[in-house]
Amino acid sequence: MILFVLPRFSGGGAERVTLNLLVELYNRGHSVGVIVFDRGGPLSHMVSDNIPIYNLDTLTLTRSIVSLVKKIRQLKPRVVFSTLGYVNVAILSIRWFLPQRTKIWIREANLPSISLPNSDHSKLMTFLYRFLYRRADKVICTSIRMKNEFISKFSISDSIMHILPNPVNVDLIRISFKTIERFDKGGVCYIAAGRLSFQKGFDRLLHWFSEINNKKSTLVILGDGSLKDELMREVKLLNIQNRVKFIGFCNNPWQWYAGADVFLLSSRWEGMPNSALEALACGTPVIATKESGGIDEIVKQGDTSITIVTGPQQFIYAMNNVKTRNKDSKNDSLLPDRYKQENATLIIEKWLNEISLKND
C-alpha cells in the first residue's frame, strides 16, 4: 500500500496534488489509502468510496502522533507519502517507531529558502528541516531550483533528491468548462486564485490592479482564507469594489480560468503553483512574479504563455499589455506534457518498481 497523509481535505494546491496522485494510482491498480486528522474539507469529493480513508479524528497534528504511529504500524504500507512541511517533519521524527521496511517519501510544496523564514517558529523549522529531511528515503521537489536549494542550503544528499512535476488532470479540467464564467464589463478579465493569505500576495495585487489603464477591466479572486475581510476593506479603500469579485472556494475554478483573458500569480513564494498550471491547461496565459517558484522553468524551456516579471511596475505593465480574447471559443491547452497527471504517475510507478526489485 501507498499511504498518503493529509491533515484534512483542504482546498490548497498541495492537497489537490496529493489527491490527484492518490486517485490516479488507484485507477492504475495500485493499493492506496489516505490518513487524515479530520475528514472535513472541500476536496473530500475527490476520493471515491472505494479508496480507504483512515480518519484519526484528532483534528490537530499534536493530538495525532500516537494514533498516526499506531495506524501506520497496523497497515504496514510500502510507502508513506506526505506533502506538507510540518507533517513531513512530524513523520520523519517518528520514523523509528514505524515498520522498518516502510519507505518515507516527503514532497515539499514551497521553496524552503522563502517559506521557512515566513513560517511560525522559523528557526526551529529550519533546524528540523536540516536535521530530519536527510532521513527521508526520498525528498520530492517540484523544480530543479527547489532541489538545488535542498542540496546547497540544507546539505541533503543528492541521492535522495527527486523531481516530480505537479500532476494536472488535463482531461478532467477540459471537460469541466463546457460553459465558461466571465466577469465582463467591457475590458480585460483578470483571474487569480489561492488561499487568501500573505503568501499569495493578493494585497499587493489589488494595488497593482487599481493602477492599470483600462478601468473597464475586472478581477476575480477565487479562494478563502484569513485575510478575506482585510482584502475586502482594501478593495473599498481603493474604490475598485465594482470591478473586483471574491468568489470564495470553488469546486470548478476551471470555468473561471477558461473565461479569463489572463491568470495573475502575485505570490511572495511558491513551490510549483498548481493553480497556474491548471490555468494553462484551460488555455489561459499567466503573468507571475519572479518569486513564484519553479514556474520559471517552463519559461526557460521556451514557453511563451507565461510572463515572469521582476517588480510591481513590470507587473502593471504586463497587465496593461493583455488583450481580450475570443469569449466564444475554447482555447487549446497551453500546459507542457510533462505536467500531465499520467506522466507524473509513471515516475512514481518507476520508484515503486525500484522498491520491489530491491526487496526481491
Show the residue positions of the predicted features.
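Short hydrophobic beta-strand element within catalytic cores of glycosyltransferases
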Residues: 285-289
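Membrane-proximal helix-turn-helix segments that form the acceptor-binding/catalytic region
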Residues: 69, 122-139
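A short, active-site helix/loop in glycosyltransferases that binds the activated sugar's phosphate group
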Residues: 134-160, 168-170
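Conserved acidic donor-binding segment of nucleotide-sugar-dependent glycosyltransferases
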Residues: 300-313, 320-326
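Aromatic "clamp/platform" in nucleotide-sugar-dependent glycosyltransferases that forms part
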Residues: 249, 268
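Short His-centered aromatic/hydrophobic patch
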Residues: 82-89, 108
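N-terminal strand-loop element at the rim of the active site
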Residues: 4-62, 153, 225-226
